[in-house]
Each structure stands twice: as C-alpha cells, then as structure tokens.
A protein has these predicted regions:
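Amphipathic helix/helix-loop-helix segment enriched in hydrophobic residues with interspersed Lys/Arg
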Residues: 1-283
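Hydrophobic, low-acid, alpha-helix-prone terminal segments
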Residues: 288-299
Length: 300
C-alpha cells in the first residue's frame, strides 16, 4: 500500500494517513462551534482541502461538537463554470435525496434559484434526517471570482450563489454549516460581494505553517501505517531540505508517493543518499514550475 496521495488532497477515506495537523483540526472544530461559516485560507498547496476533508470531517463524525451531535451529512463542491448546478449536484451526490438522477439535479437547481433562501428550501425538501447537520464544503472558492469575470456569467449569477451561502448560515432553523477553502491571494476579492468580506473576516482560519515536529509526523505517520520505517538520517535530511518553505510540502508529498510506488519495505527502512534525495526534490520542483501554476490548479 502506498500511503502518500501525492499532489491530490487527502480525502475522508485517507484520514488514517493524515498526520501533523491535530492542533489545527481541534482549532477548526472549536471555531465551527461558534461560527457556522468558516473560510479556510492559505497559499497553494498549504493543505486547505486536506485539513477539511481528512481532518475536520472525521472529527465531526466522532462527536467532537457535543452541542451538534455526531450525525452529519456532508456535500463537497467547487464553483467551476456553473456554481448553481454544481451546488445542486453536490447535494444530490451527497445522498440527501433518495434518487440520484439528472432530473433530480435539475429540480434541486430550480429550487435553489427561486429565492435567496433557496439553499434552505432545497435542504427542507431533501430526505436528510431532520436532526442531522449538513456541512457544505465549497472547495477552491476563488473560482467564483473567475466565474464572475467569465463571458458566460453575470454579476447577478455570482452574487446570487454567494448570497445563498450567506443566508443559509445566517439562520438558526436548520443546522447548516459552510466551509469554504480559498487561496489567500484572493482575500481582497471578497469585497466584490455584499457581506462576504465581513463574513469571511469573522470566520477566517489562516493555515499556519507546520513546525518541524508536525512535518516529521506528516512523513513518518503514513510510513508507519503502511508497516514500514524511515531511516533517521533520511528523515533528518528530508526535514532539512524542505525547511520552513510551505511550497516544498506538495513537492515532498509527490516525491514520497513516487518512492511509495516503488514499495515501502515492511519492517524495513526507507533509505536514500542525500544527493539522490535533493536531486529528486529539485527534479519534481522543476517539473511543476515548467507546467505553470499546477499546484494552484490541483494542489491540496
């Protein structure tokens, strides 16, 4: 088993491989108790999506928010080129409705567009257990700003989508929680929508850099889950090579995934000479830079 996902984010089913973020998970859950709208903000590849999907979601299902219980439904979406359809699709694919067919998605979309309370109405009409909470994750929220500037969009469409989210978390009748993940360089764009900047400011969670011990756990934890070990000398060199630069974390994850594809020795140790490891990291970094903003497009 290869315990490293590479460039893609950690998903819910990868939670047993997600290490080094315990403090952040606890803090995020604590903030969600006080604010139903959270904005997880950070640079490309800083682990925003992974923190929510593989960290927070399993934590919520464990009952960590006693006031909300442990019954949760979750839907994940990206705005893309049609935010309203993608929102409707995410609700249907999350199993909130007994049927999972194209016409159901169209019906849910129609409900969403009836009024500013469309998301509330869509949830009321769903087959979700009445006492269960709904967590909607809007990943790569910055896509809404690109959508607003596209030829196929209007200011009204983008603003309507944003307003649906804000209205859903401003009420207390239904237990709806929303988390957006967004690149930090788009924070200023939030002022383009009424109330969004203030709401983001109130619920902002800025992804901190991992310290050395946390980076160590992120490397050794998955290896140990896979039944292997990593040589102390190699571990020290890896930690020294990536340093405090968050841009190196996705590159390291990709390099470790490549090593994992070659096989992690059970009850043995991963070894690599310093020159070889540095060459690996440098080669992967060059590939990413040659492909442009790859990390910004698909990084975790």
């Amino acid at each position: 088993m290869n315990p490293f996902p590479g460039l893609r984010p950690f998903l819910f089913d990868d939670s047993h491989l997600f290490f080094g973020r315990d403090t952040q998970i606890t803090e995020l859950a604590s903030r969600l108790r006080k604010n139903r709208f959270l904005a997880v903000v950070g640079t490309s590849g800083s682990g925003k999506s992974s923190l929510v999907r593989a960290g927070l979601l399993p934590e919520l299902l464990s009952g960590t928010m006693a006031s909300a219980g442990s019954s949760w439904e979750s839907a994940t979406m990206r705005p893309g080129g049609d935010p309203l359809t993608n929102l409707a699709r995410s609700l249907v694919e999350a199993g909130l409705y007994d049927q999972d067919e194209p016409e159901i998605i169209s019906q849910v979309r129609a409900t969403l567009t009836r009024s500013g309370l469309g998301l509330l109405e869509a949830v009321r009409q769903s087959d979700k257990e009445k006492k269960s909470n709904l967590l909607l994750v809007v990943d790569q929220f910055e896509e809404i700003f690109r959508f607003r500037n596209s030829e196929d969009a209007t200011d009204e469409q983008a603003a309507f989508f944003v307003n649906l989210l804000l209205e859903a978390t401003a009420q207390s009748d239904l237990p709806i929680y929303i988390i957006i993940t967004m690149r930090s360089d788009f924070l200023g764009d939030c002022s383009r929508f009424p109330r969004l900047a203030d709401t983001v400011n109130e619920g902002e969670f800025l992804i901190p850099r991992l310290n050395r011990d946390q980076r160590k756990a992120a490397i050794t934890g998955p290896v140990q889950v896979a039944g292997g070990q990593i040589a102390d000398r190699l571990l020290s060199r890896l930690l020294n090579d990536i340093g405090d630069d968050p841009d190196q974390l996705p590159i390291l994850q990709h390099a470790l995934m490549r090593d994992g594809n070659r096989g992690i020795p059970r009850h043995g140790k991963m070894h690599r000479d310093r020159r070889g490891r540095r060459a690996d990291l440098h080669r992967h970094a060059m590939i990413f830079h040659q492909k442009g903003d790859l990390l910004g497009q698909i990084g975790p």
